[in-house]
Swiss-Prot record:
It comes from the Eukaryota. The C2H2-type zinc finger 5 is required for nuclear localization. It comes from Homo sapiens. O-glycosylated. This is RE1-silencing transcription factor. Induction: Up-regulated by Wnt signaling. Up-regulated in the brain of aging individuals but not in Alzheimer disease patients. Up-regulated by oxidative stress. Down-regulated during neural progenitor cell differentiation.
């Protein structure tokens, strides 16, 4: 038959009879196919359909996109890939039915078709030439009048738009109509299709319904389809045929084409010369190439390999297409725009999506429609399995890859799989998740939160250690693994103290605590950065130094760190046991039972600090600066957990890392701690700025809800601290010396803590701490400065520094309050301290108080001369320098003690800050009951040795340290009642920026919790955890400066109005909690914007 067909096709013309469907049929001749009955067509057609189904012939319309390629290339493709009409099996019958309805004889049909073929070829050619009706053929020559007349004479118009039943009298009109119609309207529903059929063929509607494939039909050859891209590709065949256009149709089925190649190819489906059958499935084909390619699907053979990359394919055409990705060749262009692609199917998809082409893929669950099969599958998958992208590290599941990538970067920033290719993540296939998705999501969140909460006790150490390591590693702590580990310990401890504060003040759930902790960390970072670029710079410098000193002092601090870690765990467990117990323990342990707390706090802080402060005294001093920056991360962890204890300790440790913290930790194990104690005081004086920021953050973050209470407590604490500073301060100095006199120090530290906590903040804030009132750290710093500076020198710098940083007027006013309140506080503190000491079994209260009083007397006289604000600020900015230079001096004696101080510094920073001048020691007790008490002891011991070497350094360091200590200790130690007091005090002392900073930080904490609660909480928490150390310190210096200015302005407004005023929108609030929540809404945005900017940089 093929030969016969070929002969006829080459012979041309009207030699065929009415039944001659094999020859080249003219447009109207081919419809003689209706002479064949359906019965005759059934069997062969079924064979072809089966073959098409198995070979994928229906699926492929590659030839639509391979028009410009050689036919031999098509030979390599599956049987149906190159057949434009393979998927349209009933096109011929439909047309033949139309012809049936026509009364014209065969001869008229032939003549008409011949004339049309002569007249139309060019226009059709052009019309299809533009890849098809997407392109606008504006310059198509109109049909000749003769053609139009003949078209009119024929009852059936040659150009018919089936979707809308429009019949064009000329090709130009038809092309214009299609252009106006737009591809989107060519996809018509079945009802419209039936109507169109009814109009086109009255008598043969039934037959047409059976074989019709869609609403779009070619009037030249009877080709019909429901896909516009197929139709436009089909028109190209007419254009290629040109004047010699011939229509080839199958004698067995309704297939018709103008391509002899495709017609012969189609006939092989009915009359295969040899059938290749697959032994593993039902596939068969008469073409060996197709069979071979199919078999490769079973064997996995991919012989076609790319020489430029690992790509390989089982088909040559796939490799050819792939090579275009390397060459950049994009030969396929959209006819309506400048879009180009390396594959025609991409252009087709583009046309459907962008140019409103048909979107045959409809979502069964919603109204979503698309022409992109991959998008369709993804979309449907979202209905079936909303969260199919699993995190390889945790149980998190995302609905989109981008969400999983965001989760992974934020939650697992230091994970070894950080560079994981998310595109390779396997989808979930558990139906369980589909049914229980909402519950699972909630459960996952609760589990994560519970895990975080559990981490606070035992798992949190590992968890936070990992997180802290991530933060530390991601930033400056990467250099030393030990540092990250210690920092992890510190963070664990901070989180524990934060949990206590949260429990005491907010009584929030454990889940909220975990989220709050994370958010607090974020806020601490933000507020820390806001507190001052100076502090950040110092912290950055200190971090670097810290890492070095940590590596050096690791040997010294490691044993202490271990014991401290155990103690920290115990403390964490105890803290979790009960909020009340935590509050009581914090107060009592800080006030009365400081020996035990000193050990756990010092040890815990030592663990947290040792890595940072552990190095030598010189390195300790360096660590101080280093820690100033690490403390932000560690402060986030430690200050949050240790805000009550470590918060002050941490600041102290950050700067004390150089002296104080290390000494605290060292003191318990070694007497050189005394030197460290002096250094701790100096560190307090020096570190307070970083600590201030850190503690302020801690106070704000940990005390966020507790902020008012903490502020009050801080103030109360600061008051006793000042009292202690003037009188008990000396006692505290002796207790720190008590590392030599361990008991007195404990007594003093704990009593000052009690006095400070119980007594109003105003008392403490009044002298130096009042400036700190909102942030007792300043007062504490000033006392610590006095102590560290050896008495007058140290203490003098702190008071001026506190007032300048926070507010000089406050510092001026507080002294009067201090004098009065200190006396009352001294008495109450003594009674409390005695009780605590008796309970703890420390040295008699009297001895410790005598020591503290003597020390505080010495300290009080030196701090009396306050430094100007400028000096304080310069010192704050120069703290690093002072610490470094001071460290140089301290290095010789302090190196040993410095390692211990580093250990103590993190948990004991707050205590050191409070104890630094012994005002700070008592203030530390107030601010960080446990940590401060421990720090106080070490400070007294270390102060004896360090007072000599660090007098100058302490004077300088204390200036910076006071500010930071004043800010942080206040909030950490303040109880709810103290919060109220603090609010009142803060209103009076709003002028002090540190207090405002603390409030802002605490507000930031609340804001993160509120903003990121619910679904976003995990991500936001993770972001804060992952990004605390990622670049906040480096990238936030500027925002910190601006935030400081804003905070100062806000404080001034607050002082005037007596309430909290938003620095961003000037809204005023009566309560600190409301203000903090509101302010955090502004700062959270800044936080993430800054982080994003950092990521881009």
């Amino acid at each position: 038959m093929a030969t016969q067909v070929m002969g006829q096709s080459s012979g041309g013309g009207g030699l065929f009879t009415s039944s001659g469907n094999i020859g080249m049929a003219l447009p109207n001749d081919m419809y003689d196919l209706h002479d064949l009955s359906k019965a005759e067509l059934a069997a062969p057609q079924l064979i072809m359909l089966a073959n098409v189904a198995l070979t994928g012939e229906v699926n492929g319309s590659c030839c639509d996109y391979l028009v410009g390629e050689e036919r031999q290339m098509a030979e390599l493709m599956p049987v149906g890939d190159n057949n434009f009409s393979d998927s349209e099996e009933g096109e011929g019958l439909e047309e033949s039915a139309d012809i049936k309805g026509e009364p014209h004889g065969l001869e008229n049909m032939e003549l008409r078709s011949l004339e049309l073929s002569v007249v139309e070829p060019q226009p059709v050619f052009e019309a299809s030439g533009a890849p098809d009706i997407y392109s606008s053929n504006k310059d198509l020559p109109p049909e000749t009048p003769g053609a139009e007349d003949k078209g009119k004479s024929s009852k059936t118009k040659p150009f018919r738009c089936k979707p809308c039943q429009y019949e064009a009298e000329s090709e130009e009109q038809f092309v214009h109509h299609i252009r106006v119609h737009s591809a989107k309207k060519f996809f018509v529903e079945e009802s419209a299709e039936k109507q169109a059929k009814a109009r086109e063929s009255g008598s043969s509607t039934a037959e047409e319904g059976d074989f019709s494939k869609g609403p779009i039909r070619c009037d030249r050859c009877g080709y019909n389809t429901n896909r516009y891209d197929h139709y436009t590709a089909h028109l190209k065949h007419h254009t290629r045929a040109g004047d010699n256009e011939r229509v080839y149709k199958c004698i067995i089925c309704t297939y018709t084409t103008v391509s002899e190649y495709h017609w012969r190819k189609h006939l092989r489906n009915h009359f295969p010369r040899k059938v290749y059958t697959c032994g593993k499935c039902n596939y068969f084909s008469d073409r060996k190439n197709n069979y071979v390619q199919h078999v490769r699907t079973h064997t996995g053979e991919r012989p076609y390999k790319c020489e430029l990359c690992p790509y390989s394919s089982s088909q040559k055409t796939h490799l050819t297409r792939h090579m275009r990705t390397h060459s950049g060749e994009k030969p396929f262009k959209c006819d309506q725009c400048s879009y180009v692609a390396s594959n025609q199917h991409e252009v087709t998809r583009h046309a459907r999506q962008v140019h409103n082409g048909p979107k045959p893929l409809n979502c069964p669950h919603c109204d979503y429609k698309t022409a992109d099969r991959s998008n369709f599958k993804k979309h449907v998958e979202l209905h079936v399995n909303p969260r199919q992208f699993n995190c390889p590290v945790c149980d998190y599941a995302a609905s989109k890859k981008c969400n999983l990538q965001y989760h992974f970067k934020s939650k697992h920033p230091t994970c070894p799989n950080k560079t994981m290719d998310v595109s390779k993540v396997k989808l979930k296939k558990t139906k369980k998740r589909e049914a229980d998705l909402p519950d699972n999501i909630t459960n996952e969140k609760t589990e994560i939160e519970q895990t975080k909460i559990k981490g606070d006790v035992a798992g949190k150490k590992n968890e936070k250690s990992v997180k802290a390591e991530k933060r530390d590693v991601s930033k400056e702590k990467k250099p030393s693994n030990n540092v990250s580990v210690i920092q992890v310990t510190t963070r664990t401890r901070k989180s524990v103290t934060e949990v206590k504060e949260m429990d005491v003040h907010t009584g929030s759930n454990s889940e909220k605590f975990s989220k709050t902790k994370k958010s607090k960390r974020k806020l601490e970072v933000d507020s820390h950065s806001l507190h001052g670029p100076v502090n950040d710079e110092e912290s950055s410098t200190k971090k670097k130094k810290k890492v070095e000193s940590k590596s050096k002092n690791n040997s010294q601090e490691v044993p202490k760190g271990d014991s401290k870690v155990e103690e920290n765990k115990k403390q964490n467990t105890c803290m979790k046991k009960s909020t009340k117990k935590k509050t009581l323990k914090n107060k009592s342990s800080k006030k009365s039972s400081k020996p035990p707390q000193k050990e756990p706090v010092e040890k815990g802080s030592a663990q947290m600090d040792p890595p940072q402060m552990g190095p030598a005294p010189t390195e300790a001093v360096q660590k101080g600066p280093v820690q100033v920056e690490p403390p932000p991360p560690m402060e986030h962890a430690q200050m949050e957990g240790a805000q009550i204890r470590p918060a002050p300790d941490e600041p102290v440790q950050m700067e004390v890392v150089q002296e104080g913290p290390a000494q605290k930790e060292l003191l318990p194990p070694v007497e050189p701690a005394q030197m460290v104690g002096a250094q701790i005081v100096l560190a307090h004086m020096e570190l307070p700025p970083p600590m201030e920021t850190a503690q302020t953050e801690v106070a704000q973050m940990g005390p966020a809800p507790m902020e008012p209470a903490q502020m009050e407590v801080a103030q109360v604490e600061s008051a006793p601290m000042q009292v202690v500073q003037k009188e008990p301060v000396q006692m505290e100095l002796s207790p720190p010396m008590e590392v030599v006199q361990k008991e007195p120090v404990q007594i003093e530290l704990s009593p000052p803590m009690e006095v400070v906590q119980k007594e109003p903040v105003k008392i403490e804030l009044s002298p130096p701490i009042e400036v700190v009132q909102k942030e007792p750290v300043q007062m504490e710093l000033s006392p610590p400065m006095g102590v560290v500076q050896k008495e007058p020198a140290q203490r003098e710098p702190p008071p001026p520094r506190e007032p300048p940083l926070h507010m000089e007027p406050i510092s001026k006013k507080p002294p009067l309050r201090k004098d009065k309140k200190e006396k009352s506080n001294m008495q109450s503190e003594r009674a409390r301290k005695e009780q605590v000491l008796i309970e703890v079994g420390l040295v008699p209260v009297k001895d410790s108080w005598l020591l503290k009083e003597s020390v505080s007397t010495e300290d009080l006289s030196p701090p009396s001369p306050p430094l100007p604000k400028e000096n304080l600020r310069e010192e704050a900015s120069g703290d690093q320098k002072l610490l470094n230079t001071g460290e140089g001096n301290k290095e010789a004696p302090l190196q040993k003690v410095g390692a211990e101080e580093a250990d103590e510094s993190l948990p004991g920073l707050a205590a050191n800050i409070n104890e630094s001048t012994h005002i700070s020691s008592s203030g530390q007790n107030l601010n960080t009951p446990e940590g401060e008490t421990l720090n106080g002891k070490h400070q007294t011991d270390s102060i004896v040795c360090e007072m000599k070497m660090d007098t100058d350094q302490n004077t300088r360091e204390n200036l910076t340290g006071i500010n930071s200590t004043v800010e942080e200790p206040v909030s950490p130690m303040l109880p709810p009642s103290a919060v109220e007091e603090r609010e009142a005090v803060s209103k009076t002392a709003l002028a002090s920026p540190p207090a405002t900073m603390a409030a802002n930080e605490s507000q930031e904490i609340d804001e993160d919790e509120g903003i990121h609660s619910h679904e976003g909480s995990d991500l936001s928490d993770n972001m804060s955890e992952g990004s605390d150390d990622s670049g906040l310190h480096g990238a936030r210096p500027v925002p910190q400066e601006s935030s400081r200015k804003n905070a100062k302005e806000a404080l001034a407004v607050k002082a005037a109005k007596g309430d909290f005023v938003c620095i961003f929108c000037d809204r005023s609030f009566r309560k600190g909690k409301d203000y903090s929540k509101h302010l955090n809404r502004h700062l959270v945005n800044v936080y993430y914007l800054e982080e994003a900017a950092q990521g881009q940089e």
